[in-house]
Amino acid sequence: MSETDAGAPGAPEAAEGQAPGIRILAQFIRDLSFENPRAPDALRAAQTQPQIDLGVEMNARGREDGLFEVDLKLSARATRDDGALFVVELLYGGVFQIAGVPAEDLEPVLLIECPRYLFPFARRIIADVTAEGGFPPFMLDPIDFAGVYAARKAQEQEQVGHA
């Protein structure tokens, strides 16, 4: 689910000759959840690899001060035939200052480039939390945020076409 509010007061206007720029002013954990429902039994070595289901969501919104908040939500659920091993959900946020980006390009910058900056930090948090839960660190593979964005835009267009 993606949401942008490019019309926020103080939203950047593309200035003549101004080079586009992104500054990360803050990064933070907005919400973190780790469930280990079958500990300690689930920590024993097993013959089969767990099934991993991943989820990725990006949201962005303009603030009254002209900055933008971007949230990256990552979730992972590991299961085996006998049930869930762990569930981790992280909502990781950042405050960004965007300069020199035309209004029509702002949404892709907020939902592709900004999450790309946040991802390595969120990935590390998930790896650390799963390791502290007694499992090997769960290292998320890199995410193609441009592909996720394109798929969401295509889905939105399809929904508009059916309306």
UniProtKB/Swiss-Prot annotation:
Give the location in the cell. Answer: Cytoplasm
Quaternary state and interactors: Homotetramer, a dimer of dimers. One homotetramer interacts with 1 SecA dimer.
Q: Which residues form a coiled coil?
A: none
Q: What is the lineage of its organism?
A: Bacteria, Pseudomonadati, Pseudomonadota, Alphaproteobacteria, Caulobacterales
Q: Which GO terms describe its molecular function?
A: unfolded protein binding
- Originating organism: Phenylobacterium zucineum (strain HLK1)
GO CC annotations on file: cytoplasm
Domain of life where this protein originates: Bacteria
| GO biological process entries | protein folding; protein tetramerization; protein transport
- Report the Pfam families cross-referenced here: SecB
Official protein name in the record: Protein-export protein SecB
Where does this chain mainly localize?
Answer: cytoplasm
Q: Which family does this protein fall into? A: Belongs to the SecB family.
Q: Which UniProt keywords apply?
A: Chaperone, Cytoplasm, Protein transport, Translocation, Transport
Q: What does this protein do?
A: One of the proteins required for the normal export of preproteins out of the cell cytoplasm. It is a molecular chaperone that binds to a subset of precursor proteins, maintaining them in a translocation-competent state. It also specifically binds to its receptor SecA.
